[in-house]
UniProtKB/Swiss-Prot annotation:
Belongs to the ChlB/BchB/BchZ family. Substrate binds at residues 428-429. Its cofactor is [4Fe-4S] cluster. Its EC number is 1.3.7.7. It comes from Cyanothece sp. (strain PCC 7425 / ATCC 29141). Keywords: 4Fe-4S, ATP-binding, Chlorophyll biosynthesis, Iron, Iron-sulfur, Metal-binding, Nucleotide-binding, Oxidoreductase, Photosynthesis. [4Fe-4S] cluster binds at residue 36. GO terms for molecular function: 4 iron, 4 sulfur cluster binding; ATP binding; metal ion binding; oxidoreductase activity, acting on iron-sulfur proteins as donors; oxidoreductase activity, acting on the CH-CH group of donors, iron-sulfur protein as acceptor. Component of the dark-operative protochlorophyllide reductase (DPOR) that uses Mg-ATP and reduced ferredoxin to reduce ring D of protochlorophyllide (Pchlide) to form chlorophyllide a (Chlide). This reaction is light-independent. The NB-protein (ChlN-ChlB) is the catalytic component of the complex. It catalyses: chlorophyllide a + oxidized 2[4Fe-4S]-[ferredoxin] + 2 ADP + 2 phosphate = protochlorophyllide a + reduced 2[4Fe-4S]-[ferredoxin] + 2 ATP + 2 H2O. One of its GO terms (biological process) is photosynthesis, dark reaction. This is Light-independent protochlorophyllide reductase subunit B.
Length: 507
């Protein structure tokens, strides 16, 4: 457990509740003190849905600490079963309530004797895993539970006559998941593949027994769905594709892998003409990468940071498809760091694997990129350093749950990424116009370091003079001046200090 005011991936129970609330007619019960019950508020605020979040908190209070939790937890499970009539109730503790070391499995067994719904306890170690790992495991657990049930009742169906696919890992609170799901369905329809099931988003647990009838599973996000796909491969011999179709090159690679699996399964398909048509005529990305607009970006420096799926894909797109120099690429998925390093090593100069936001901020400040591609936190860092930022991965705020259609996957996703990349760089003329006519670039310079350890102060005259320096070199001048001041023991930076530093650097 770690005390922090910013986390890239939340605690384990958030992942479990994301999976439970993604399914249709599944209720989550969180055994937790009041401080841990923010999931409902967060989901209700961010997801644009009309229904209430199906999660109830079984509050751990002083009465529970005195008497034990069993009576209260069992009562909450049976009460929700009677009120909501769910198909499944998922009980999860939080890392805080896990300290009590209670036998929650016993509570579940007892409660299930008097409920119509199935009841399971999330099989997650709340001290060792984060939100993404817990989501992956909970999805696998629910799939296992219902397929074991179907197998015992002899209800496992045969494979469909024509090619079909399950899309695994589409969840609530995912980064552009709803739009990505729509785009993947369109892509599968264009390839002549029927979408059998999409889980967990809006899926019924009663339909999970239909999963084995698909020809293969598609796992667009490495973080959630991979464990379920591996289970289905082991138990039912179902192949899976775990290539995220982000960017023209990776989308083509994903489609070719699908083609290989279908042809091995007895189909006879050739998608090369489709790939060529989409790449040349439908997606604007290939044309954009050859245009003068993109050539203006060639050689510009950028940094990339996010979850594994999006950070890897974005690094490859910037480096391989747009000629942008990725100074470093990073991920907060430390548990899967080896895979990340292996994927990006040929496309960037350096790799950063950490979930410490201060370390990420300092790494950005050190290399002074022309643009940042990261999470909501890197957006804040960019504003403090006056560096533009495109948001490419969770965690994100409300502006990355857009009302309009903005997928990141598939061929339409490549167009969206092109727009994001181009609009993230401050163009030269825009910079000058902001200087001439006023705008966001003329406000007072923020003079804090990212780690908030600055021991220097700027006078008003010094800041005014600093503001006169063009935006694209202002950050560098500011840092050089502060280094000059520290070396000479100057605590207050005036106009004279600024000029003295300039002369020292020039000399």
């Amino acid at each position: 457990m770690k005390l922090a005011y910013w986390m890239y991936a939340g605690p384990a129970h958030i992942g479990t509740l994301r999976i439970a609330s993604s399914f249709k007619n599944v209720h989550g019960i969180m055994h937790a003190p009041l401080g841990d019950d923010y999931f409902n508020v967060m989901r209700s605020m961010l997801e644009r849905e009309r229904d209430f979040t199906p999660v109830t908190t079984s509050v751990v209070d002083r009465h529970v600490l005195a008497r034990g939790s069993q009576e209260k937890v069992v009562d909450n499970i049976t009460r929700k079963d009677g009120e909501e009539h769910p198909d499944l109730i998922v009980l999860t503790p939080t890392c805080t309530s896990s300290i009590l070391q209670e036998d929650l499995q016993n509570f579940v067994t007892r409660a299930s004797l008097s409920t119509q719904a199935d009841v399971i306890l999330a099989d997650v170690n709340h001290y060792r895993v984060n939100e993404l790992q817990a989501a992956d495991r909970t999805l696998e657990q629910i799939v296992q539970f219902y397929l074991a049930k179907a197998r015992a009742e002899g209800e496992i169906p045969d494979r469909t006559a024509t090619p079909s696919v399950n899309i695994l890992g589409m969840t609530t609170l995912g980064f552009h998941n709803q739009h990505d799901c729509t785009e993947l369905k369109k892509l599968m329809a264009d390839l002549g593949i029927t979408v059998n099931e999409v889980i967990p988003a809006n899926a019924s647990v009663h339909n999970l027994k239909r999963l084995p009838q698909a020809w293969f599973n598609l796992v667009p996000y490495r973080e959630v769905g991979l464990m379920a796909a591996r289970y289905l491969e082991t138990e039912f011999g179902m192949p899976y594709v775990d290539i995220a179709p982000m960017g023209v090159v990776e989308t083509a690679r994903c489609i070719r892998k699908i083609q290989q699996i279908l042809n091995q399964g007895g189909a006879s398909v050739d998608y090369e003409e489709f790939i060529n048509t989409q790449t040349v005529h439908v997606s604007q990305a290939a044309w954009f990468s050859r245009s003068i607009d993109c050539q203006n970006l060639t050689g510009k420096k950028a940094v990339v940071y996010g979850d594994n799926t999006h950070a890897v894909a974005m690094t490859k797109i910037l480096s391989r498809e747009m000629g942008i120099k990725v100074v470093w690429a990073g991920t907060y998925c430390k548990y899967d760091g080896d895979w990340f390093r292996d994927q990006v090593k040929d496309y960037c100069d350096d790799v950063l694997i950490t979930d410490d936001h201060a370390q990420v901020g300092d790494a950005i400040a050190r290399v002074e990129p022309a643009a940042i591609f990261g999470t909501q936190m890197e957006r804040h860092v960019g504003k403090r350093l006056n560096i533009p930022c495109g948001v490419i991965a969770a965690p994100v705020h409300i502006q990355n749950f857009p009302v309009g259609y903005r997928p990141f996957l598939g061929y339409e996703g490549t167009n969206q990424i092109c727009d994001l990349v181009y609009n993230s760089f401050t163009l030269g003329m825009e910079d000058h116009l902001l200087e001439f006519f006023g705008g966001h670039d003329t406000k007072e310079v923020i003079h804090k370091g990212i780690s908030a350890e600055s021991d220097l102060t700027w006078t008003a005259e010094g800041l005014t003079e600093l503001n006169k320096i063009p935006g694209f070199v202002r950050g560098k001048v500011k840092r050089n001046t502060e280094k000059f001041a520290r070396d000479r023991g100057i605590s207050e930076i005036t106009v004279e200090t600024l000029y003295a530093a300039k002369e020292a650097v020039g000399a």
